[in-house]
Curated annotation (Swiss-Prot):
Mg(2+) binds at H61, H125. Its cofactor is Mg(2+). PANTHER family: CARBOHYDRATE DEACETYLASE (PTHR31609:SF1), YDJC DEACETYLASE FAMILY MEMBER (PTHR31609). Keywords: Carbohydrate metabolism, Chitin degradation, Cytoplasm, Hydrolase, Magnesium, Metal-binding, Polysaccharide degradation. NCBIfam families: PRK02134.1. CDD domains: YdjC_EF3048_like. InterPro entries: COD_ChbG_bac, Glyco_hydro/deAcase_b/a-brl, YdjC-like. Belongs to the YdjC deacetylase family. ChbG subfamily. This is Chitooligosaccharide deacetylase.
Length: 253
């Protein structure tokens, strides 16, 4: 039986360069799935591109750390925007959980308006849905909508998160990130998953063509390196040789 490999490109909608990079890796590479930032400046462009990509799984990249929220959530914003102070609020047990529920629903509804259908699955920008206070909210919401979510199993075990009833891949790997991007690194994620006995795996990626909005990102030109690796023809063959079949989160349902 083939192992399922979901290659997800985060940050769909972040910019046109990000969008074009993800599309390139879907059409000419191994990206099968992406997750959309519905409050980002390039999201309408992303939704337009998707009309010609029927086989690309598109999920919701829930964000509480970037841009303007889609609902009135004053406790989470400063000067009207979201930011990384969320970590400090979480550490101090000061997260406004009711506001987070409202914003999650607002971003979900915005996704449906933009793409004309529910998301393929749910994950989050900067992995905020794996915070111990936020995970139960996202998990319950996803179960109500019968949607899969990304689960970092190691982090879930560390934080003692209840994943019962959650639809997700057996494994999740975020190693394909940073300054040492290569085909060998990508294939290592597959070999590691097999060694752990996982039948399904999601690998997180961030491929992009670089444009001006991305130049201010702390993770910029590495995105272009990811694109180059993910579109190498030899990579698809190496994946097949390891017994993996490319798919999306919908293949788990």
């Amino acid at each position: 039986m083939a192992h399922l490999l979901i290659v997800n490109a985060d940050d769909f909608g972040l910019s046109r360069g990000q969008n074009y990079g993800i599309v390139e890796c879907h059409r000419h590479g191994i990206v099968t799935s992406t997750t959309a930032l519905v409050n980002a400046e390039g999201i309408e462009h992303a939704a337009q591109l998707c009309k010609e990509l029927p086989h690309l799984g598109v999920g919701l990249h829930f964000t509480l750390t970037m841009g303007q929220p889609l609902s009135p959530i004053p406790s989470l914003t400063r000067n009207g925007v979201l930011g990384k102070w969320l970590w400090q609020m979480a550490e101090q047990e000061q997260l406004p959980l009711d506001e987070i529920r409202v914003e999650l629903n607002a971003q979900y509804q915005r996704f449906v308006e933009l793409f004309g259908c529910p998301p393929d699955h749910i994950d989050s920008h900067h992995h905020v849905h794996m915070f111990k206070q936020i995970f139960p909210i996202v998990a319950e919401f996803a179960q109500q909508k019968a949607l899969p979510i990304r689960v970092d199993r190691l982090l879930a075990q560390k934080e003692n998160l209840n994943t019962q009833g959650v639809i997700s891949s057996d494994g999740f790997d975020s190693q394909f990130y940073g300054d040492e991007i290569s085909q060998a690194l990508f294939l290592k994620t597959l070999d590691d998953a097999k060694a752990r006995g996982e039948q399904s795996l999601e690998v997180m990626t961030h491929p992009a063509f670089i444009d001006n909005p991305l130049r201010v990102s702390g993770y910029c030109f590495q995105r272009l390196t990811e694109l180059e690796v993910l579109t190498q023809s030899s990579l698809k063959q190496a994946i097949a040789e390891r017994g993996y079949q490319l798919g999306t989160y919908q293949d788990l349902i």
